[in-house]
């Protein structure tokens, strides 16, 4: 303390340094509330989808539960890429390096695409081996459902990773509402289409509905990116 006081007094926290920044508190509260709503809508949608899956009986439920565990691991790569883009965009935007903001999305998107393609191939090729880690080898019907689901949804994963990159970009720029509307639109469409199609298509309905939801979300975010880029 004495060393800092004599050498670097600016590093010490004084009573006059403590206070409330009203505008900053409002911004923080607004971002936090929107992020909470986004997360809530995502998990409410997952509950609705689970309700549709429950109509398939025990094999369908077991297959979907195992498949979502595999998806959770796969999605972590896209989410990490989106978080990295968010940090890069916000830091460069704050520093006034607008050219690097665009490059952050460009290279982050390319990285997400590369990882997304690799993840898709691994899911498609190795779905059976991965599912057997969570399902018994004797549960052939659940394995059949799970393999069909994983292989079908892996074809759409490029849209999932693209959406994650866009989400990171918009969050980094502070456009939290765009991220919220994109997520909410995706999950509502996913839940609605799953409920409509699951009686005829089985678990594949959830995979197709999820893929269409990702495509809608990416289309919405791309339109808004072009709008912001042009202005």
Regions found by a protein language model. Give the residues of each.
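Short runs within selected transmembrane alpha-helices of multi-pass transporters and secretion channels
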Residues: 1, 79-82, 153-172, 178-190, ...
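Short alpha-helical transmembrane segments in multi-pass integral membrane proteins
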Residues: 1-33, 89-155, 197-231
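Hydrophobic faces of transmembrane alpha-helices in multi-pass small-molecule transporters and flippases
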Residues: 17-48, 52-53, 69, 73, ...
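Residue-level signal for transmembrane alpha-helical positions in Major Facilitator Superfamily
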Residues: 33, 41, 45, 69, ...
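Transmembrane alpha-helix boundary and packing residues in multipass membrane permease domains
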Residues: 35, 39, 47, 51, ...
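Helix-terminus/linker motif at the lipid-water interface of multi-pass membrane proteins
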Residues: 40-73, 91-92, 129-140, 196, ...
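Alpha-helical membrane-inserting segments
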Residues: 41, 45, 49, 53, ...
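Small-residue-rich hydrophobic transmembrane alpha-helices
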Residues: 63-121, 125-127, 160-174, 178-182
């Amino acid at each position: 303390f004495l060393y800092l006081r004599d050498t670097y007094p600016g590093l010490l926290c004084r009573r006059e340094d403590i206070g409330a920044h009203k505008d900053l508190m409002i911004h923080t509260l607004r971002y936090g509330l929107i992020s909470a709503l986004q997360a809530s809508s995502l998990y409410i949608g997952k509950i609705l989808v689970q309700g549709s899956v429950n109509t398939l009986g025990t094999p369908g439920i077991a297959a979907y539960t195992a498949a979502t565990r595999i998806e959770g691991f796969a999605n972590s790569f896209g989410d990490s890429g989106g978080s990295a883009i968010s940090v890069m965009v916000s830091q460069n935007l704050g520093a006034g390096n607008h050219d690097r903001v665009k490059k952050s999305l460009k290279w982050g998107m390319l990285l997400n695409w590369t990882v997304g393609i690799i993840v898709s191939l691994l899911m498609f090729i190795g779905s059976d081996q991965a599912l057997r880690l969570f399902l018994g080898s004797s549960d052939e019907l659940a394995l059949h459902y799970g393999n069909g689901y994983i292989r079908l949804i892996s074809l759409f994963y490029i849209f999932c990773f693209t959406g994650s990159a866009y989400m990171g970009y918009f969050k980094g720029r502070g456009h939290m509402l765009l991220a919220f509307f994109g997520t909410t639109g995706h999950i509502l469409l996913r839940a609605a289409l799953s409920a409509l199609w699951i009686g005829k298509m089985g678990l594949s309905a959830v995979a197709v509905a999820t893929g269409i939801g990702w495509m809608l979300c990416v289309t919405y975010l791309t339109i808004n990116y072009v709008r912001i880029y042009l202005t």
